[in-house]
Amino acid sequence: MEMKVPNGLTLNDEWTPRNLMLQAFPEAVLPDHLQEDELPLSPVYKFVSRAMKLDRLLEVWIPHGANIVLTGENWSVMLKEYENDSWLTVGKTSKSSKTQESENFVCKSNHVRFKTDHLSTFKLIGKIDTSKSTFVFKRMKVVAFCSETRVGEDLVVRVYCFDDCEWSFERMMRTEQKTGGRLMSPIESVSFSVTSGKDVDISVKNLAGWQMKKASPLKFSYESLRNSFNVIPRCDLVFQNCRKTLSTSIFVEMVLNHEPSGETTIYASASLKKRILGDPLVRALDPEKVEE
């Protein structure tokens, strides 16, 4: 029997301990001295229960962000446990196989499985092969949001590039819910190369009736994407109306160039809130200058 618990984990067992709680937080909260060829593949997961030790093994599934399907031979996925103020490796895949199974550690295309008889703190780390001129990809997603905007105001588009796991998605959604964010685009996939050393540039196209006023920045930096489990990379684009007739909606095409895997295109749109009679801007405008 599978039981989904918050933050994307799955407990796969007919038996689960009572009063089980789960805390998930960025890797930076309990920092690890990662090597140059290592990067986080999950947040830190801490299991909390009244019972410190279990009376039987519990199977746990943790999602990871490595693109095993495309570049599994260049990834080594490690399961680490926090003990005595330090991180210890308790499970590891082989670089010679896309999936590595052992008695207590299994790595699949988008998650690992392991069994534990105690409740502790775990995370996943990816180690990449830098001895060859090869590309190693991480699975990510990109999406655009905006807040409620009135006709005649500048529109701020927030573009996120987040890890392809439930925890990152929920974390981003909580941020947007606090500011009344509105979804502008479908969620698209991005294969980010963790070995290219290149930023992911964003270009904006087909801005009918609008122009980009500023961007901070107009890219996702390489370092921010490598460490996206700590801070979700975000780009804020500000658009202003450039028509004599004010637009009541916006459509924008954004292209992410992520060499060497190619490009990802986002089509984002939103309707602007109409102003009511008595609004200072309405009084200042000729009614014919606002789109119906």
What are these regions (language model features)?
Residues 1-292:
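Proteolytic cleavage junctions
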